[in-house]
Amino acid sequence: MVEWTDKERSIISDIFSHMDYDDIGPKALSRCLVVYPWTQRYFSGFGNLYNAEGIMSNANVAAHGIKVLHGLDRGVKNMDNIAATYADLSTLHSEKLHVDPDNFKLLSDCITIVLAAKMGHAFTAETQGAFQKFLAVVVSALGKQYH
């Protein structure tokens, strides 16, 4: 079980309460697909993923990026039981979709980069530490079914 300080809980809740899901989600997933092109294989039904411009303007990518962030919001609401919160999603990604669990970390890094760019100076080291701890716990939970 993960220990969360009151400060970490506050930072994470604050980030998600102010996050523009419609902006951050599409940008983060698009960045992941452009920077790590091998991740595109999981999105073959999304249409044009042939170049950065096509990815960045792809409505399916944008919608899934938003969906991912709303999925993270479930973790924020269940910080004391993140593993159980993502158990079904872990099973889906491992057994049906066969997603390499390393890709969850890549996407979490892209989310962090996009969020940091959006928050600017407000994305302090303390904020980054709490946010990345949260994402690491979620990534671990999503990878549970693979172990």
Swiss-Prot record:
GO terms for cellular component: blood microparticle; haptoglobin-hemoglobin complex; hemoglobin complex. Pfam families: Globin. Keywords: Heme, Iron, Metal-binding, Oxygen transport, Transport. It comes from the Eukaryota. Red blood cells. GO terms for molecular function: haptoglobin binding; heme binding; metal ion binding; organic acid binding; oxygen binding; oxygen carrier activity; peroxidase activity. The keyword Nucleotidyltransferase does not apply. Heme b binds at H64, H93. GO terms for biological process: hydrogen peroxide catabolic process. InterPro entries: Globin, Globin-like_sf, Globin/Proto, Hemoglobin_b, Hemoglobin_oxygen_transport. Residues 3-147 form the Globin domain. Belongs to the globin family. Heterotetramer of two alpha chains and two beta chains. Involved in oxygen transport from gills to the various peripheral tissues. This is Hemoglobin subunit beta. It comes from Trematomus hansoni (Striped rockcod). The lineage of its organism: Eukaryota, Metazoa, Chordata, Craniata, Vertebrata.
